[in-house]
């Protein structure tokens, strides 16, 4: 998708804020723990290449979702370890090896497919994924884990690490978290040959369960300055959001009593109202359910009226403003502030999703 540089809608990314957030977490965990930056999904909408280049010197490696994301980083000049968290199909192993990309092995069946297809695993670096209770990919049985580690070694692969992922580390109720932690500890202790690198800590675990860190943390949404729990748990120390979203008024008109606005004519003007048009819509990830939410114009909250269209939305203005007046959708303007979590609450979703849905049509400026 082509970024729309010739319209005034843009995302502003503060790379220094991201670096400072990483350092803040590092200051609150033991100094001997490794830090992996999670830059999947285009670094949660912030720009994977730009973010990775900026923080490469202060982290020990990177985590991505799939092989294409990993290759993008390698081609951009990133040299540190890149772990693909998802499953890469056997026929793509040679490509991963050629790019020195570390793969996740989540089942003995995957290894059997490699053997059946005569895939050369020699020199491949892998981490074993353990399903401690998330229910997605990963090994559940200790016997399978031991066989995997043994047979991968015999095949010439290098088993560098083993990891799991917590489902509820961002919740106040620790019951499920403790169950998973116990499962993973028992699994690790039962291995005949445990890999050197053991990691289970995501953003939430690094914030609220730092005492359970093994020897590495995977920093995701916290790196971008967002609370993984939304509003459920207070942050133990400050972090700063790295992304703001802004646009400009491209059209302003006065509508009179009874006039209707937008698809479905869902908004009806009462009295005389100034209505401004902003060039952002659901094709940009600013979804239709944002009707009734507010944005900031001239330091004041202005309601989104009518349905959000594919490319545009309309807002009610307290007075006539000129074309080109700044509109803040996420971020600070004057004394008003709209956070990504505010947007998420309006949509009844999580702040992660808000950022990841911001499409490539919106150019990122650093």
Curated annotation (Swiss-Prot):
Gene Ontology CC terms, in alphabetical order: cytosol
Alphabetized UniProt keyword annotations: Isomerase, Pyridoxal phosphate
Give the annotated active site. 40, 263
Question: What InterPro entries does the database record attribute to this sequence?
Answer: Ala_racemase, Ala_racemase/Decarboxylase_C, Ala_racemase_C, Ala_racemase_N, Ala_racemase_pyridoxalP-BS, PLP-binding_barrel
Q: Could you state a single Gene Ontology molecular function term?
A: alanine racemase activity
Q: Report which residue ranges the record marks as coiled coil.
A: none
Q: Which cofactor does it need?
A: pyridoxal 5'-phosphate
Q: Where does the source fall among the domains of life?
A: Bacteria
Q: Which residues bind substrate?
A: 136, 310
Q: Which GO terms describe its biological process?
A: D-alanine biosynthetic process; peptidoglycan biosynthetic process
The UniProt entry, under PANTHER family, shows: ALANINE RACEMASE (PTHR30511), ALANINE RACEMASE, CATABOLIC-RELATED (PTHR30511:SF0)
State the EC number(s).
5.1.1.1
Q: What does this protein do?
A: Catalyzes the interconversion of L-alanine and D-alanine. May also act on other amino acids.
Annotated positions of the N6-(pyridoxal phosphate)lysine modification: 40
Protein name, per record: Alanine racemase
Reaction(s) catalysed by this chain, per the record, are:
L-alanine = D-alanine
Q: Does the keyword Glycoprotein apply?
A: no
User: What CDD domains does its record include?
Assistant: PLPDE_III_AR
Pathways per UniProt: Amino-acid biosynthesis; D-alanine biosynthesis; D-alanine from L-alanine: step 1/1
Q: What is the enzyme's main class? A: isomerase
Query: What is the similarity comment for this entry?
Result: Belongs to the alanine racemase family.
């Amino acid at each position: 998708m082509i970024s729309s540089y010739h319209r005034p809608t843009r995302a502003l990314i503060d790379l220094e804020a991201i670096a400072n957030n990483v350092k803040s977490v590092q200051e609150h965990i033991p100094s001997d723990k490794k830090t992996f930056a999670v830059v999947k999904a285009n670094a949660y909408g912030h720009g994977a290449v730009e973010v990775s280049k900026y923080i490469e010197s202060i982290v020990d490696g990177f985590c991505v979702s799939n092989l294409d994301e990993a290759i993008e980083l390698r081609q951009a000049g990133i040299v540190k370890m890149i772990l693909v968290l998802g499953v890469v199909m056997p026929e793509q192993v040679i490509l991963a090896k050629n790019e020195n990309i570390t793969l996740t092995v989540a089942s003995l069946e995957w290894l059997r497919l490699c053997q059946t297809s005569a895939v050369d695993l020699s020199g491949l670096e892998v981490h074993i994924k353990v399903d401690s209770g998330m229910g997605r990919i990963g090994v559940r049985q200790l016997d399978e884990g031991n066989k995997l580690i043994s047979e991968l070694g015999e095949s010439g692969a290098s088993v560098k690490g083993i990891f799991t992922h917590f489902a509820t580390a961002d919740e106040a109720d620790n019951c499920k978290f403790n169950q998973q932690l116990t499962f993973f500890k028992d699994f690790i202790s039962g291995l005949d040959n445990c890999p050197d690198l053991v990691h289970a800590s995501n953003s939430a675990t690094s914030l609220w369960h730092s005492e359970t860190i093994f020897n590495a943390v995977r920093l995701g949404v916290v790196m971008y300055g967002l609370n993984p729990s939304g509003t459920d748990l207070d942050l133990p120390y400050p972090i700063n959001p790295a992304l703001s979203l802004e646009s400009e008024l491209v059209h302003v008109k006065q509508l009179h009593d009874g006039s209707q606005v937008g698809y479905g004519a869902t908004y009806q003007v009462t009295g005389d109202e100034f209505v401004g048009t902003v060039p952002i819509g659901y094709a940009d990830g600013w979804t239709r359910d944002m009707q009734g939410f507010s944005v900031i114009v001239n330091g004041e909250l202005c309601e989104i009226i009518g349905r959000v269209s594919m490319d545009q939305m309309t807002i009610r203005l307290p007075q006539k403003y000129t074309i080109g007046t700044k509109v803040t959708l996420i971020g600070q303007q004057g004394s008003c502030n709209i956070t990504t979590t505010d947007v998420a609450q309006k949509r009844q979703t999580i702040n992660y999703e808000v950022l990841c849905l911001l499409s490539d049509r919106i150019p990122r400026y650093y």
